[in-house]
């Protein structure tokens, strides 16, 4: 099924939020067809309220939801997730993801969005993560060094469908190569 123009901001740390929020709001104001889903690394009422106020002050409608079914039933421009355990499902509903942690402790799981064929954007703290390097090398995602690169990267993906499709295919290719390698290992083990 055709996915909507939705950006998932997943495993968000405060450092990610602080780095990209103004760029994100600027982009959303200029591109009214884009919706976002925001999933904090550790969802809590204080952070949800803080985020909600920022978006509402910028005249963006906000819903805070605690289940996958509610994500599908609201029409707000901004959906804030107030639960854990549904990220893997959310990736199948979006065209692009920003994966948090890259401005603090290290970027989070990049294979989950790749499995869903979703290109990723992440911060500069990724070098100790082999899959992040692979995603960049294969063109399945981009890294930003600071917030100013975020809006430009969103424009590059959402406003040029070819880039999005190409990166999405690269993400799927990475997963397929991992599956192929796993099969070879299992077959090799089975011989012994």
Which residues are covered by each model-predicted region?
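Nucleotide-activated sugar donor-binding and catalytic core shared by glycosyltransferases
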Residues: 1-192
């Amino acid at each position: 099924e055709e996915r909507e123009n939705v950006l998932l901001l997943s495993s968000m740390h405060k450092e990610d939020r602080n780095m990209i929020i103004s760029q994100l709001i600027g982009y959303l104001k200029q591109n009214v067809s884009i919706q976002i889903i925001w999933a904090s690394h550790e969802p809590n009422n204080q952070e949800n309220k803080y985020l909600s106020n920022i978006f509402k002050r910028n005249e963006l409608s906000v819903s805070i939801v605690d289940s996958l079914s509610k994500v599908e039933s609201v029409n707000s421009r901004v959906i804030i997730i107030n639960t854990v355990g549904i990220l893997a499902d959310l990736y199948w509903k979006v065209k692009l993801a920003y994966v948090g942690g890259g401005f603090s402790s290290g970027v989070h799981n990049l294979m989950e969005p790749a499995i869903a064929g979703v290109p990723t954007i992440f911060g500069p703290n990724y070098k100790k993560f082999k899959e992040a390097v692979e995603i960049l090398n294969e063109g399945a995602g981009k890294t930003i060094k600071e917030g100013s690169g975020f809006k430009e990267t969103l424009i590059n993906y959402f406003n040029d469908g070819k880039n999005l499709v190409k990166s999405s295919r690269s993400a799927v290719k990475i997963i397929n190569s991992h599956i192929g390698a796993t099969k070879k290992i299992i077959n090799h083990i089975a011989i012994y």
